[in-house]
From Swiss-Prot:
It comes from Shigella boydii serotype 18 (strain CDC 3083-94 / BS512). InterPro entries: 16SrRNA_methylTrfase_J, SAM-dependent_MTases_sf. Its main location: cytoplasm. The lineage of its organism: Bacteria, Pseudomonadati, Pseudomonadota, Gammaproteobacteria, Enterobacterales. GO terms for cellular component: cytoplasm. The keyword rRNA processing applies. Its EC number is 2.1.1.242. The gene is rsmJ. Pfam families: SAM_MT (PF04445). Belongs to the methyltransferase superfamily. RsmJ family. GO terms for molecular function: rRNA (guanine-N2-)-methyltransferase activity. Keywords: Cytoplasm, Methyltransferase, rRNA processing, S-adenosyl-L-methionine, Transferase. CDD domains: AdoMet_MTases. This is Ribosomal RNA small subunit methyltransferase J. S-adenosyl-L-methionine binds at R101, D102, E117, R118, S153, S154, D171.
Length: 250
């Protein structure tokens, strides 16, 4: 995959070249998207809109730390949707990991989560965030046990994953309403890189065959159900709904 690669560390140790080789990235000086290695982290920038800033994965500080400490925990919609109850903490495959936020919420309340991400740039961002998270004194211990990254396309990997999870979680990119003020700066950068998941409808069936209990699909409230398969079961929040489908028991 071609992207502009920029090293701002000043270290001159070739770390960016190693990273590019690992994730199959090729430097393209004219690409509008840039993957930048800073002294602190790896980040994604949209070069024609510098005011949008850089996107990076941070499980330790910022919004994720606040959500971990002061968020709803088990009361969060995604936790309710996957079926967390009492001692039941399902094993989850997040087949559209993105920046790992929902996966992190589930891991922070006790679920073991395997994240799938097919875009190599996003996978590199996730891997960088995980490495910093694993090294953190406060959360590193449980994060290593509960949150892992698999760099693969969900369309093929969903048939190969073992052991089977109890829950498969899907949050495919859906085109945002153009005038929506809710399309945050971060989303604009992210969508410029990955675009909408045009093949997302193909995920539902393999997800239902893989999950032993249920499949949860996060959708904007204005979006049709995935693959146009309706379900009466959903957890509804302001702006979104989590559609729930039966899996395939062992």
């Amino acid at each position: 995959m071609k992207i502009c690669l920029i090293d701002e560390t000043g270290a001159g140790d070739g770390a960016l070249s190693v990273l590019a080789a690992r994730w199959g990235l090729e430097h393209d000086e004219d690409n509008l998207m840039a993957l930048v290695l800073t002294p602190e982290h790896l980040e994604l920038r949209k070069r024609d809109e510098p005011k949008l800033g850089g996107i990076f994965v941070d499980f330790v500080g910022g919004a994720m730390a606040h959500r971990r400490k002061f968020g709803g925990g088990r009361g969060e919609a995604v936790a309710k949707a996957v079926g967390i109850k009492g001692d039941y903490l399902p094993d989850v495959v997040d087949a559209t990991a993105g920046l790992g936020r929902d996966a992190f919420v589930l891991a922070s309340v006790g679920c073991r989560v395997r994240m799938l991400e097919r875009n190599p740039v996003v996978a590199a961002l996730l891997d960088d965030g995980l490495a910093r998270g694993y090294a953190d004194a406060e959360i590193g211990g449980w994060l290593q046990e509960r949150l892992q990254l698999i760099h693969a396309s969900s369309l093929t990997a969903l048939t190969d994953i073992t052991p089977r999870p109890q829950v498969v979680y899907l949050d495919p990119m859906f085109p945002h309403k153009q005038k929506s003020a809710l399309v945050k700066k971060e989303m604009r950068v992210f969508q410029s890189l990955v675009g909408p998941d045009l093949d997302a409808d193909g995920l539902l069936e393999p997800a239902r065959l893989l999950a032993t209990k249920r499949v949860v699909v996060k959708r904007p409230d204005y979006a049709p159900p995935l693959a146009n398969v309706t379900t009466p079961n959903a957890v509804v929040t302001k702006g979104h709904r989590f559609d729930i489908y039966a899996g395939t028991p062992v």
